[in-house]
Each structure stands twice: as structure tokens, then as C-alpha cells.
Amino acid sequence: MQGRAGAGEAAGAGSEADAPVSLLPLFAWLTPSFPVGAYAYSHTLEWAVEAGDIRDEESLGTFLGDLLALGFGRSDAILAAHAHRAAAVGDKTALAEVNALAVALAPSAELRLETCQQGRSFLDAVRAAWPAPGLDAAAAALVGEVAYPVAVGLAAGVHGLPLAPTLEAFLLATVQNLVSAAVRLAPIGQTAGTRVVARLAPGVRALALEIPTLTLDDLGSATFRADLGSFRHETQYTRLFRS
């Protein structure tokens, strides 16, 4: 009996050791309830609705699809991937360099505030509730402003979370946050917003698979109208959002 019990315990221990890395932290971090203040930002959608660029479900899907594939979605994912790799091996110099680049790439004051406020809030919340060996040391390398994608990549890398699902979760959360903003701006309803998320999900998957092959030299954006919209939003007469 003792032998059988011992064998069972050994088998149980082996099963736990062989289990895949839990992705539960991603499910917790990249949800609307995580305290980063994402609800306060629309990433130029508020201006796009005012200007008539976003009028309905179809135009919203097109606008967000462009932001994802040609704009900040792609660039942020590249930055998150490089922060993930640097954090995973404890390369503080590389982390600081990626973060400085990410902050500098923000095309306007409002979008810089958006990424830096969320980045610092995200990092503070993870450190407070999800400690891990090396997390505080990695965070200490980022003095002052912290870009949101860098904060996400850092936390996931330190926690040993795989890069591909981290990128998928990060990009999908980005889409969901922007769709939520669009619903509050009222050009679409909740059901239409859900369809937009489903429409963009394959693009999220494809981009998450592509990003690990890209370098910092591949950073770039072709969403000029959205970038200009972030400037115009600063003086927009009626505003619900900070960007």
C-alpha cells in the first residue's frame, strides 16, 4: 500500500511539473477590470467618430483593422515582443532602450499620455499583486515613463509566459478596448461591436504569429489620418476620452 501511495504521489508530482505554463496571468492582466485606466482612452476613435470616419459597424471594422495591421497595433506588438525577450533573460539595458524608443514613437502628447499612464499603472499593479523573481529588478530599469506594450512584455517575460499567447492576448485586448470605446461613442451597439471583434480576431492571430520574426527595424506606421486625429482631438469641443 505504501508503495502504491508513493508511486501515486510521484506520478502526481510529475504531472504537475510537466504541465504547460498557466496563462491565467494574461487572462487577469488584459481584461477591462485590470486597473490601467484603459476606459479613459479611445486612441483617436472619438475624433474619428466626430469627423465621420467611423459611422457604423463596417467603417469601425475597417478603421480598427488598419490600426491593427498598419498602425500602432503592429508597432506596439513588436515593442512588446522585444521587451518580453529582454525581460526573460534579465537584460536591463535592452529593456531600457526598448522603452525609450516606445515612448519616443508616440505621435502626439495625448497618445504619449495614453501609453505611459497605462504602462506605469500596469507595471505597478502587476508588482503589487503578481510578484515574481526578477520583476522588481526589471521594473527598476524603467525610470520615469513606461510605455504600455513594454510593461506588458516585461511582466510576461519575467513570469515565463510564452511570447505567442502574450501577443495574441495583448492585441485582442487592444481591439476589445477600442470597440468598447466605440460602443460608448454610440455609432454602433454591443452586438455589432462583438461582431467587429470576431471579424478582427483572425488578423490578431496572424499578426501575433508574424511579430516574433520582426526586428525593431520593422517598426513603422501608415495610419497618418489617425495620427493627425490625435492632434485634432486635443481641441475637440466635446470629449468623453483623454485621447
From Swiss-Prot:
Give the main location.
Answer: cytoplasm
Q: Print the keywords alphabetically.
A: Chaperone, Cytoplasm, Nickel insertion
How it assembles, according to the record, is: UreD, UreF and UreG form a complex that acts as a GTP-hydrolysis-dependent molecular chaperone, activating the urease apoprotein by helping to assemble the nickel containing metallocenter of UreC. The UreE protein probably delivers the nickel.
| Protein family per UniProt | Belongs to the UreF family.
According to its record, what are the GO cellular component terms? cytoplasm
User: What protein is this chain from?
Assistant: Urease accessory protein UreF
Instruction: Recall the GO molecular function terms of this protein's record.
Output: nickel cation binding
Per the record's keyword annotation, is Cytoplasm included, yes or no? yes
Q: What domain of life does the native source organism fall in?
A: Bacteria
Task: Tell me if Cytoplasm is a UniProt keyword of this record.
Answer: yes
Stored HAMAP family = UreF
Query: Cellular location of this protein?
Result: Cytoplasm
Tell me, what does this protein do in biology? Answer: Required for maturation of urease via the functional incorporation of the urease nickel metallocenter.
